[in-house]
Structures are given as structure tokens and as C-alpha cells.
């Protein structure tokens, strides 16, 4: 996954169906959810609603959790 121009891009190397992705701003508890559609391998999330400043984020993909810091 990488961040660019207000969006998080998540690339899957194979098709993942019935996968739910959530990005949570730990500071504000803002959550952005996305359900992966059939055949979708590149997910683009607009995270502009998370707010400016340093965001401690949690990305949940099904049962896997990843943590990161974004400076917006």
C-alpha cells in the first residue's frame, strides 16, 4: 500500500473477493470502509476526510491489521 495525493492505493497480486478494507484514524476514530468488488485488484481510497496533520492510521484487511503514520 502507498499514499499519494490524498489517496491510499492498495495493490493485490491476486483477486480478492468478499474482502472488507477499513482505514481508521486512531486520533479521531474516523473510519473509511471499502468492500472489494469481484475482480478488483487495485483499491483506491480517498482519505481526505481523515483530516490534516499527523494521522495514526490502522488498515484492516479482513483479519489482518496494519499500522502506519500519515502526515497530511
Stretches found by the model and what they are:
Residues 11, 35, 44-46, 69-71:
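Generic structural detector for well-ordered beta-strands
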Residues 13-19, 27, 50:
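Short proline/glycine-enriched turn/loop motifs at strand-loop junctions of beta-rich domains
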Residues 30-39:
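Solvent-exposed serine/threonine-rich low-complexity stretches and specific carbohydrate-binding patches
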Amino acid at each position: 500500500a502507498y499514499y499519494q495525493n490524498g489517496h491510499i492505493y492498495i495493490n493485490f497480486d491476486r483477486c480478492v473477493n468478499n474482502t472488507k478494507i477499513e482505514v481508521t484514524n486512531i486520533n479521531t476514530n474516523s473510519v473509511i470502509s471499502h468492500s472489494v468488488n469481484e475482480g478488483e485488484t487495485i483499491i483506491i481510497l480517498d482519505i481526505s476526510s481523515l483530516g490534516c496533520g499527523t494521522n495514526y492510521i490502522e488498515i484492516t484487511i479482513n483479519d489482518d491489521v496494519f499500522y502506519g503514520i500519515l502526515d497530511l
